[in-house]
Design a protein with these regions (language model features):
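Alpha-helical transmembrane segments of polytopic membrane proteins
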Residues: 1, 48-63, 100-108, 152-159
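Symmetry-related core transmembrane helices of the 12-TM Major Facilitator Superfamily/SLC fold
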Residues: 1-7, 149-174
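Flexible interhelical linker loops that connect adjacent transmembrane helices
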Residues: 1-27
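Loop-to-transmembrane helix entry
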Residues: 19-24, 41-61, 80
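Helix-loop boundary and gating motifs at the non-cytosolic
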Residues: 24-47, 116
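Helix-to-loop junctions at the C-terminal end of transmembrane segments
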Residues: 61-78
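C-terminal transmembrane helical hairpin of 12-TM major facilitator-type secondary transporters
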Residues: 75-115
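A late C-terminal transmembrane helix in Major Facilitator Superfamily
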Residues: 121-158
Length: 182
């Protein structure tokens, strides 16, 4: 844990100490980077140029507040983030700028808080390795997808991520059932 952050009660620490996998964090950064870079280059839809600044700012703040104060289980957070990214991509594909300017900033802020809560617990060496994968590889791959106009392949990633999350939940449910039977 960090010495720079205030200590919280043990009840709060339980929910904040959930670490998310490097795979999940890389996926979120990739999805964000690919959508952000695609949006930046798309002249047919722009949530920044089309006057949605208030919605964007408001839902960034709401995303931070929700990530900090709503206590939900790790798998539920992962599923929520994936669903919100899927909705963001859906609203991008169907050119629904208003709803995109609400959902996308919310998920950006929400997942960033979740990532920061995970990274703050890592030692410097581990953090350096994570930053290579998160900051360079995942974001660079997202940029590549946008530059090469491969954004339509992203829905396949949603399917793979959803299957991974559902499989993890099923395994945890089986383990819980097995432990409860003793």
């Amino acid at each position: 844990t960090s010495t720079l952050l205030p200590h919280t009660s043990s009840a709060k620490k339980v929910s904040l100490t959930e670490s998310f996998s490097l795979f999940a964090m890389m996926l979120w950064i990739f999805l964000d980077s690919a959508l952000f870079e695609s949006l930046s280059r798309d002249i047919s839809i722009s949530i920044w140029r089309d006057g949605y600044s208030l919605e964007i700012a408001l839902f960034h703040i709401i995303g931070v507040v929700c990530a900090l104060y709503f206590k939900i289980q790790k798998n539920q957070k992962e599923l929520l983030i994936i669903i919100l990214f899927a909705l963001s991509y859906l609203f991008y594909f169907i050119q629904e700028a208003l709803i995109l300017s609400i959902v996308y900033p919310f998920v950006i802020s929400f997942y960033n808080v979740v990532i920061l809560q995970t990274l703050v617990k890592k030692d410097l060496k581990t953090l350096s390795i994570y930053m290579i994968f998160i900051g360079w590889i995942a974001s660079g791959t997202g940029l590549f997808v946008a530059l090469e106009n491969l954004i339509l392949f992203v829905p396949m990633l949603f399917l793979m991520a959803l299957l991974k999350i559902l499989n993890t939940q099923q395994i945890q449910h089986k383990e819980k059932t097995c432990l409860n039977s003793f």
